[in-house]
């Protein structure tokens, strides 16, 4: 998807504290429609806290979050999901005793419009909705993420790398405008990392999806390869923002990661 000048997500002067610990201090940035916008920083920099403020798990003590020019600072997570904000997590939030297909279906529930009675009896509009949603999942998501062979397997029996795909699939089932990806590459081997990076690019670039991505990730090689812009945090403060090249050469970023090393990025290619 081509990056536009349209601002889709805007974060203004966010402050978040837990007791006496300042997790975020005056964070401001904007994400344009069609971007892969990555957030980097050492452990404890505030990256996940920031995602939690964007999707509504946390409400900041100060500042504002806007999505599609609407103030969503006090909106609940389900309200933001209805607006088109989806999310994956560092710690997988899957139902291990359910099948892959059932886990993915949970991401579609917000689009269901039938009532309780017709839903329980499964007739008429309910049946049509079920067919439509199942078709969307099978035709678009399962095919995209190459998980047809595991669709009926219990999630808890799958290797970790495939569970990561299932969580991404469930987030995509919302058919989001923007997806927040919290360390999607963590714990994956090299082949799985390359596959996941390809999936993220497909989600962003393919005409069917064209989804804006906000990526929190520690794999600097992938971040620098696929991002349009990057923001760096350290101890709850923004220390840099710009193109991947600008950020990887920024002395504050290099110092935060590697002391006084010459360059942050060592290419994998």
Cite the ranges covered by each PLM segment.
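Glycine-rich phosphate-binding loops of nucleotide-dependent enzymes
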Residues: 2-269
